[in-house]
Amino acid sequence: MSEESVVVAFCCYEUGYGAADLAGTGRAQYPSSVRIVRVPCTGRVGIEHILTALAKGAWTVFVAGUKKGECSYEDGNLKCERRVQAAKKLLEELGIEPERVEIYFMSSAEADKFVAAVKEMHERAKELGPLA
């Protein structure tokens, strides 16, 4: 039995989700393994959300937020960046590959960046496999 990888993407409503939506309306090709979770701001994404996604079956998790200096909620994306780094450190301490988690910054007009993020995290998922 072959399992299909699952990539969870936490996308802020303003930019990350806008880029995902633009990719969809533009009929961009990217792996169907991505599951998008729309959040008001990436500043609302905590370490617990990332770890829960992994615990519930995600092979990789990424956050798609506003470009640095352009967060609609001032510095939510920077707060999330610190949390992603903390999550990676915690995973490493637990013996889990920190490469399973990433953050990307993009504007709502950058569908290509969203597609590239999905493809990169899908490839990482295939390389790393599921969590045991």
Curated annotation (Swiss-Prot):
It is an enzyme of class 1 (oxidoreductase). The F420-non-reducing hydrogenase vhu is composed of four subunits; VhuA, VhuD, VhuG and VhuU. It comes from Methanopyrus kandleri (strain AV19 / DSM 6324 / JCM 9639 / NBRC 100938). Keywords: 2Fe-2S, Electron transport, Iron, Iron-sulfur, Metal-binding, Oxidoreductase, Selenocysteine, Transport. The keyword DNA repair does not apply. The keyword RNA-binding does not apply. One of its GO terms (molecular function) is oxidoreductase activity. The lineage of its organism: Archaea, Methanobacteriati, Methanobacteriota, Methanomada group, Methanopyri. Its EC number is 1.12.99.-. Belongs to the MvhD/VhuD family. It comes from the Archaea. Binds 1 [2Fe-2S] cluster. This is F420-non-reducing hydrogenase vhu iron-sulfur subunit D. InterPro entries: MvhD/FlpD. Its cofactor is [2Fe-2S] cluster.
